[in-house]
Amino acid sequence: MGAANIFTIGMGVAQYNAQGKIGKYNQGVNNRNAKVLENQAIQLEQKAEFDIAQFNKSFKKIEGSTKVATAKSGAVVDSGSAYYVALSNAYEAELQKKLIEYNAKIAADNKREEATFAIIKGQIARNQASLAQLQTIATTGSSLLTMNKGSKIA
């Protein structure tokens, strides 16, 4: 086996190994990105819980102030217009909480979808590296055959 053959084989092996490492690295990067995105989804859900708690706190203050103002005016708190205002406020509060939950769920679902795509992108990178490795094997083999055309390979 001549020096050219040894060089060709050596370079083919080096290229094959490098392609494998690049594929694994790219897959690892995308898997890490997926974990970051998944954690962001969890944070969005936790933020929604916090936002609802803060909203409830603010709503209770406003509700209390409204009851005090109504009582000071001499109106009966649990009847008539005051009752309907309180009922309307309670309805709006529930609507606002549902809106906070909905928006957080949509944002978290979007992050999870991005995470899924990152994993898929990593798998594609790994598959592309494997295909490149196969191409390297084929090219190296073809080069060796071309170089040794007409001579006996021992």
Stretches found by the model and what they are:
Residues 4-153:
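Glycine-/small-residue-biased sites that favor an extended, beta-strand-like backbone
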